[in-house]
Every structure is written in structure tokens, then in C-alpha cells.
């Protein structure tokens, strides 16, 4: 298996590139995503996550799941069922507290599933 070679900042860059590669967006959405691109993953808020397109949120959660595994080679798999289970919980937790740390909310929900 491939060892995880990315750090949290690399993950953020990849997530941001994917988020910004979508079609035309409203100017405020562009500004929001541009601001998000300047943040480290640990600095993202639930509000940042809430601003993403719904269809992209599972991708972001997938990155979080991967990095939460702490780079262990034996854990370097994509758990689609787990991601599908935890994504709605993270979305709901972030709706409840938009100013909260996205990373901390995601970690709390991941502990319940993984």
C-alpha cells in the first residue's frame, strides 16, 4: 500500500483546488473559497465547511478520515461506508456550531464511527 505522504496543508491545497475547479459561482462564494484556500486545515471553521457544495463535502470528509488515520500504512484505505455514515453527522454538527473548529467537530464525529 502507499504510505500517506501528505500533511494537513497539502490536503487543504488539494481540497481547495478541487473546490475551486467547479463551474461558475456567485462572487461571494468565490471570495469564501479563496479565503478558505489561505487557511490551514486546523484553522477551518464549520462555516467554511458549510459553504462548500453539498456534493463536495464527502470528499473533504474523506481527506479528514485519511489524515485521522495518522499515516499508518495498514489503514491507508478508503472506507466509503464510513464516510457515507459520518458525513451527515459532521454536516449536522457544523450546522449547530458554524464558528466551531471544523477539524475538532470532524474528529469528534469520526471517533463515533471509526
From Swiss-Prot:
Q: Name one GO biological process term.
A: cellular stress response to acidic pH
Keywords attached to this entry: Chaperone, Disulfide bond, Periplasm, Signal
SS bonds (residue pairs): 46-94
* Localization in the cell: Periplasm
Q: Which residues form the signal peptide?
A: 1-26
Q: Could you confirm whether the keyword S-adenosyl-L-methionine appears in this record?
A: no
Fetch the Pfam families from UniProt: HdeA
Gene Ontology cellular-component terms listed: outer membrane-bounded periplasmic space
Which InterPro entries would you find in this protein's record?
HdeA, HdeA/HdeB_sf, HdeA_sf, HNS-dep_expression_A/B
Reported function: Required for optimal acid stress protection. Exhibits a chaperone-like activity only at low pH by suppressing non-specifically the aggregation of denaturated periplasmic proteins.
**Any idea what this protein is called?**
Probable acid stress chaperone HdeA
> Mind giving the lineage of the organism this protein is from?
Bacteria, Pseudomonadati, Pseudomonadota, Alphaproteobacteria, Hyphomicrobiales
